């Protein structure tokens, strides 16, 4: 399943047409009772960005989101895996418990591989069922089968609980 097809209203289609298409470097892999996100990028920072967008893309069609507001996130971990976990969990918190914020784009501003800290920014808006199609709720991020391949073309595999 390369892209989730959601039934879009004419208003949602109009918003999508207003902005350039999002360059998606992620896919969804089948996993028992959960969903595995697979993201990649030219850099590890881009793979992190794409992993966050894959998570949001499972909840709604991010191309219907307008870049009206910005939110910055700072996360930290004990290693790269825990950093990825907290990065995704902090973004999920902004959606589910805090501001109901859904980004159109997430950009990593700084990734410190020695201190395991990351700063990122998202451009988007408050999730609104009248405006954004409802996908599947993401309940939590898991450490299960998490992989970060930091090679020439970095890849990330992360499982989300739905």
From Swiss-Prot:
Alphabetical keyword list: Calcium, Metal-binding, tRNA processing
Q: Write down the PANTHER family for this protein, in alphabetical order.
A: ARCHEASE, PROTEIN ARCHEASE
What InterPro entries does its record include? Archease, Archease_dom, Archease_dom_sf
Q: Which domain of life is it from?
A: Eukaryota
What is the recorded function of this protein according to its Swiss-Prot or TrEMBL entry? Component of the tRNA-splicing ligase complex required to facilitate the enzymatic turnover of catalytic subunit RTCB. Together with ddx1, acts by facilitating the guanylylation of RTCB, a key intermediate step in tRNA ligation.
Q: Name one GO biological process term.
A: tRNA splicing, via endonucleolytic cleavage and ligation
Give any Pfam family that matches: Archease
Which Gene Ontology terms cover its molecular function? metal ion binding
What's this protein's family per the entry? Belongs to the archease family.
Name of the featured protein: Protein archease
Subunit note: Component of the tRNA-splicing ligase complex.
GO CC list? tRNA-splicing ligase complex
UniProt binding sites for Ca(2+): 34, 161-162
